[in-house]
Amino acid sequence: MIGQIILKALSSNAKITVTVLTRQESSSTTEFPVGVTVHKTDFSPSSLRPLLRGQDVLISAVGGTAFTEQKKFVDAAIEAGVKRFIPSEFSTSSEDDAVIQLLPLFQQKRDIINYLKEKEEEGLSWTGIATSGLFDWVSCLLLPRLIYYD
């Protein structure tokens, strides 16, 4: 879901070249916008490195089952010369201890942020984007009569 939102926003800007990396075994029938390059990969370091060469930024939009896999992305990005990494930190900040208590899975997000801090000295900058809750998703699916938008 968040990946599609990011893709739509970035691909609408003609000054940005967008490349999407997707799982080899994905059966998704998603139609990608014109001009977007799509590579299917097994996400191994050896397959990621050549796909990341020449890229300025790597945005990870993986879900909860793949938070820890982002370490491979970080390492491959450094080896390929990527300048900035944006981890899948979307939603509530993993820096908040109360969040970790409520959502233990977010410890994996915090671990990635700590890993990125360690890797800064290797030339990779990073940005964590904590959007808080995705209220439009909550209001549409879980609480359709609680929150209204005009």
Segments predicted by a language model, with ranges:
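Oxidoreductase cofactor-interface core, primarily capturing Rossmann-like NAD(P)-dependent enzymes
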Residues: 1-33, 45-46, 67-68, 80, ...
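Hydrophobic/aromatic beta-strand patches that form the interior of the parallel beta-sheet core
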Residues: 19-21, 39, 59, 86, ...
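Conserved Rossmann-fold cofactor-binding substructure of NAD(P)-dependent oxidoreductases
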Residues: 29-57, 64-69
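CheY-like receiver
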Residues: 50-51, 76, 115
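Domain-wide signal for the mature, well-folded portions of proteins, strongly enriched
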Residues: 59, 89, 109-110
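Residues that line or immediately flank small-molecule/substrate-binding pockets and catalytic motifs
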Residues: 62, 89, 133
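Short, conserved SAM-binding segment of the class I
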Residues: 69-72, 76
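ADP-ribose/adenylate-binding Rossmann-like module
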Residues: 76-92
